Amino acid sequence: MSLVARRSLLALSIGTALGAADVRAETPTGGRRLALRGYDPVAYFTLGRPEKGEETFSFAFDDAVYRFKTAEHRAMFAADPERYAPQYAGFCAAGVSKGIKVEPDPEAWAIVGGKLYVVAQKEKIDEFKRDPSGFIGKADTNWPVVRESAPKVPAR
């Protein structure tokens, strides 16, 4: 490769990398993952259903950004994030039980033992509910390793 071609390739690579960094820094999540695809984790507990959160009411926790339907929900989460944050950083509990990190469907959920669990598919939530302790036991064992891995399925 000629010197001119190498310099052009280098300039293009640097420009692309800088452009990507700039876009990431400008995102509303500050480069962090948007947990629960923007659904309000407190709503599962207070309303008994999933509700889309608003960008205006956001809170960063555990390398992710959570959104909330109301300022009150944001304040409740900020005061006690361990109480309201979904288990496994909001990744699919069934996936974690199998040793993989998968983005969830926020509408496929269950509260077990006062903790929020989400799974990747609505069809899987009934299976999870039939044997929550089986899924949770395996997921708890796998989570320390799975936590460090990359998600297998990108967010929708």
Listing of model-derived features with the role each one plays in the protein:
Residues I14-D22:
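Hydrophobic h-region of N-terminal signal peptides that target proteins for export
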Residues A21-R156:
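Charged, low-complexity intrinsically disordered segments
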Residues M1-G15:
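N-terminal secretory signal peptides and thylakoid transit peptides that target proteins
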